[in-house]
């Protein structure tokens, strides 16, 4: 769950 959010945030940044 957390790792998935990190991937999304990294994608936005």
From Swiss-Prot:
Could be used to protect potato plants from fungi Phytophthora infestans, Phytophthora erythroseptica and bacterium Erwinia carotovora, since the analog N-terminally modified MsrA3 (F1MASRHMF), when expressed in potato plants, conveys strong resistance to late blight and pink rot phytopathogens in addition to the bacterial pathogen Erwinia carotovora. Transgenic tubers remained disease-free during storage for more than 2 years. One of its GO terms (biological process) is innate immune response. GO terms for molecular function: lipid binding. The keyword Nucleotidyltransferase does not apply. The modification Leucine amide is found at residue 13. Changing residue 3 to Q: Weak increase in activity against Gram-positive and Gram-negative bacteria and fungi, and important increase in hemolytic activity. Expressed by the skin glands. It comes from the Eukaryota. Transmembrane segments: none annotated. GO terms for cellular component: extracellular region; membrane; other organism cell membrane. It is found in: Secreted; Target cell membrane; Target cell, Target cell cytoplasm. Keywords: Amidation, Amphibian defense peptide, Antibiotic, Antimicrobial, Antiviral protein, Immunity, Innate immunity, Lipid-binding, Membrane, Pharmaceutical, Secreted, Target cell cytoplasm, Target cell membrane, Target membrane. Belongs to the frog skin active peptide (FSAP) family. Temporin subfamily. Adopts helical conformation in LPS micelles fro residues L4-I12. Amphipathic alpha-helical antimicrobial peptide with potent activity against Gram-positive bacteria, weak activity against Gram-negative bacteria, and moderate activity against fungi. Mainly acts by causing membrane permeabilization. Is also able to kill S.aureus (both wild-type and MRSA) that are internalized in human keratinocytes without injuring host cells. Rapidly inactivates both channel catfish herpesvirus (ED(50)=15 uM) and frog virus 3 (ED(50)=58 uM) over a wide temperature range. Also displays anti-leishmania activity by damaging parasite membrane. Forms helical oligomeric structures in LPS lipids, the major constituent of Gram-negative bacteria outer membrane. Adopts monomeric helical conformations when bound to bacterial (anionic) and eukaryotic (zwitterionic) model membranes. In Gram-positive bacterial mimetic membranes, the aggregation is weakly pronounced, and penetration proceeds more rapidly and is deeper than in Gram-negative bacterial mimetic membranes where aggregation is high. Self-association is prevented by temporin-L. This is Temporin-1Ta. It comes from Rana temporaria (European common frog).
């Amino acid at each position: 769950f957390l790792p998935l959010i990190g991937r999304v945030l990294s994608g936005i940044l």
